[in-house]
């Protein structure tokens, strides 16, 4: 919802669903101060529809969408919500214990108002081998904390929650490296951070001599993925494809399985910023009648 102008003049905005016959009583309790709200947004609210990707573009990684990849300043971030109470975070500790990441912290209600607080734990990998989220929710807890009191929070996060899908090997993997963990009241309101080393796999390079499936790209521009019922597999149509972390080895030639719709086409292979080869692709009756060039 684009309510940029309204929120400049309103100290708070209550967002609710129909919520049933008790909505009126609940609403009255909130606006009168008898109850301190602690709802949190489960989505990112952008300032304008122009910040959204085209409706036919569903790839949130390429389009830097959702709280995972968005680099702008949203109207309201993922996990956001107001409260009548005020909380302070302290004593943040993060450790790797075997297959578990142990996280602990203290949260103090420094106001006189009793209220729930939703503690959110996010993480990101530093210098990943592929594009990873800027922050990713990995745990949260909602607890009632009386005014002036402190609550201790502990989270045991399975290390498998840090995994990503390695397209080069078509499997999930926890990559070895440095991970930053963040504790906050929303995806933008981060109060404490800590970076630790996490054991895992060293992602191996792509060995071109073993072949690469076109669909297992790291990035693309202008290309579309299609599916051939005849071949029972996906193929890429047009544009360009990017494959990172490749090893050419001692190869002296490259084979590409491809086809062209109507006109004679051309495929160019670049490696390390240099053009390795170019191949002419003759037109066929069916684009999925591939040939090796």
Locate predicted features.
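Short aromatic-acidic-glycine turn motif
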Residues: 52-53, 123-142, 275-278
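Extracytoplasmic
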Residues: 176-180, 187-293
């Amino acid at each position: 919802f684009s309510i940029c102008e309204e929120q400049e003049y309103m100290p708070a905005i209550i967002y609710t669903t129909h919520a049933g016959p008790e909505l009126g009583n609940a609403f009255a309790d909130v606006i009168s101060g008898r109850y301190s709200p602690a709802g949190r947004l489960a989505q990112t609210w952008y300032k304008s529809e122009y910040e959204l990707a085209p409706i036919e573009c569903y790839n949130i990684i390429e389009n830097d969408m959702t709280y995972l990849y968005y680099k702008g300043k949203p109207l309201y971030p993922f996990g956001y919500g107001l409260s009548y109470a005020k909380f302070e975070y302290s004593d943040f500790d993060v450790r790797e214990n075997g297959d578990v990441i142990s996280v602990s912290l203290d949260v103090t209600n420094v106001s006189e108002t009793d209220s729930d607080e939703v503690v959110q734990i996010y993480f990101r990998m530093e210098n990943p081998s592929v594009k990873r989220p800027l922050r990713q929710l990995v745990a949260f807890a909602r607890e009632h904390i009386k005014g002036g009191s402190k609550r201790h929070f502990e989270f045991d996060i399975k290390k498998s929650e840090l995994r990503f899908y390695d397209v080069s090997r078509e499997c999930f993997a926890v990559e070895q490296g440095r991970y930053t963990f963040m504790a906050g009241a929303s995806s933008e309101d981060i109060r404490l951070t800590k970076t630790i080393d996490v054991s895992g796999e060293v992602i191996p390079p792509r060995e071109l001599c073993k072949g690469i499936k076109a669909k297992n790209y790291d990035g693309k521009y202008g290309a579309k993925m299609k599916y051939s019922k005849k071949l029972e597999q996906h193929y890429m149509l047009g544009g360009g494809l990017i494959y990172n972390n490749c090893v050419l080895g001692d190869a002296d030639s490259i084979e590409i399985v491809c086809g062209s719709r109507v006109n004679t086409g051309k495929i160019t292979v670049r490696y390390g910023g240099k053009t390795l080869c170019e191949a002419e692709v003759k037109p066929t009756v069916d684009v999925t009648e591939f040939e090796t060039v």
